[in-house]
Amino acid sequence: MKEHGLEAYRPKTVLFDMDGVLYDSMKFHAIAWNKAMAKYGIDMPEIEGYMYEGMRGVETIAIKCREQLGREISEDEAMEMYLEKSRIFHSMTKATIMPGVKELQRFMLSREMQITVVTGSGQPPLLAGLARDFEGLIDADKIVSAKDVKQGKPAPDPYLLGMERMGSKPEETIVVENAPLGVQAGRAAGCFVIGVNTGPLPDSQLKDNGAHIVFHDMFEVKDALERFLDSQNEKTLD
């Protein structure tokens, strides 16, 4: 963080993405997108599930229909397709919690940071599970989901709303993201963005879309953040 000119940085709020950050779930989403879109005559390779991750589902569907069917679709049509994708996703094995993320959050709380989640998902079962799985770690009442914003990632709106709910300013806020569109959204909102590359995309996809720094798991994030904050404390004592 020092190399980004943040010698005096004092983060107060951390906004986590959900899929691919809190849960090791992206492989299931990618498969579900591929299978669901194929039913409607749309080719969506699994890798695109990672590229579009973070965007509201109906927006992803509208883009793919425009590209491959050559027409605009109604909100009802998009929702029908999204519900099919959700049905396939929920028929799969339940995604596990990302290794190291709870340890990272406990550390953040010990350093007086507040935490919530900003996700492009709007599925009630996932949001309910999120509040349950991370009870005591995240501020569940302030979660931002797809239903809370008109423009999803890569627009800054979800993260701007997250900061508003947490009473935080951009210069006090860290965004933790795994997806290019989410990284774009965090940067557009003015936050310091940590990219955690937990999927098959090259690191450059996160760096080129604006991640200030890229790690490969939550243990790396915790170690780096702890070193940085400890160095800050040493300066204060000096």
Q: Regions from the language model: what does each represent?
A:
Residues V21, T119-S121:
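Conserved phosphate-coupling serine/threonine residues in phosphotransfer and NTP-handling enzymes
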Residues M1-K12, D76, K102, R106, ...:
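Asp-based, Mg2+/Mn2+-dependent phosphohydrolase catalytic module
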Residues K2-M18, L22-R111:
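N-terminal helical cap/lid subdomain that shapes the substrate entry/recognition surface
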